[in-house]
Amino acid sequence: RRIRDIREDNDLTQQQIAEILGTSQTMYARYERGANELPIRHLIRLAEYYRLSTDYLLGLTNEKKPYPSKKIKTR
C-alpha cells in the first residue's frame, strides 16, 4: 500500500504515525498491510499531515497535491 511508502519516504515509524492518528502501532500496521480498511477519519488526517490528496493516498491518482480548498461564499 502507498501509505507505507509515504511513511518510509518521510523517515517516520509506524508508532509515530499511529500516535498522530490516535491508534495503536499494531492497528496502523494492519492498515499498511491491507488487513484492515483505513477509516475515513484516518485517511483525512494522513492527507492533511502529509499535505497530499486522499486520492493519491488511496492509489487512485499519481497527483500528489491536495485539491484546492473551496472558498465558501457568504452573503
Stretch-by-stretch model annotation:
Residues L58-R75:
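Short, charged recognition helix plus adjacent turn
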Residues R1-D9:
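A short, Lys/Arg-rich alpha-helix, primarily the initiator
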Residues E32, Y50, L58-T61:
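DNA major-groove recognition helix of helix-turn-helix
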Residues D11-R33, R45:
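Short alpha-helical DNA-recognition segment
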Residues R7, E32, D55:
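Acidic active-site catalytic centers that drive phospho-/nucleotidyl reactions
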Residues G22, P39-Y56:
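DNA major-groove recognition helix of helix-turn-helix/homeodomain DNA-binding modules
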